[in-house]
């Protein structure tokens, strides 16, 4: 019985850690700070095409998380990369992938994702 409690406690600690851990290679920015920097960077929307077409930040390129492996060479290493998705989960995954596979150093994400965005959007 004690063994089960230890396993349960291990799972709880793991999920709490995953929830609140902030990767050192990714900077999470408020909308105000995101707007200040993304015009001088590569702005990448990692949502799926249907989500992107429903509305996206003006100037963003759509490279869905599902296509990132095939299209990662479209992202330059020598410029900052500003990422966003609907809520933040996919942008974190994309940042981890770009850091590991492409060696991208300058990575930023929109805090709260597109659902928290109140700035200008473009719809197709």
Language-model features, listed with the residues they occupy:
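Rhodanese-like catalytic fold shared by cysteine-dependent sulfurtransferases
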Residues: 1-31, 37-41, 49-78, 92-124
């Amino acid at each position: 019985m004690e063994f089960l409690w230890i396993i349960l406690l291990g799972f709880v600690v793991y999920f709490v850690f995953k929830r609140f851990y902030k990767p050192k290679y990714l900077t999470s920015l408020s909308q105000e700070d995101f707007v200040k920097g993304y015009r001088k960077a590569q702005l990448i929307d990692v949502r799926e095409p249907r989500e992107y077409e429903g509305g996206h930040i003006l100037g963003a390129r759509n490279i869905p998380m599902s296509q990132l492996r095939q299209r990662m060479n479209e992202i330059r290493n020598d410029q900052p990369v500003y990422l966003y998705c609907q809520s933040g989960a996919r942008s974190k995954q994309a940042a981890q992938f770009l850091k590991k596979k492409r060696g991208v150093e300058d990575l930023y994400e929109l805090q709260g994702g597109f659902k928290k965005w109140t700035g200008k959007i473009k719809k197709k």
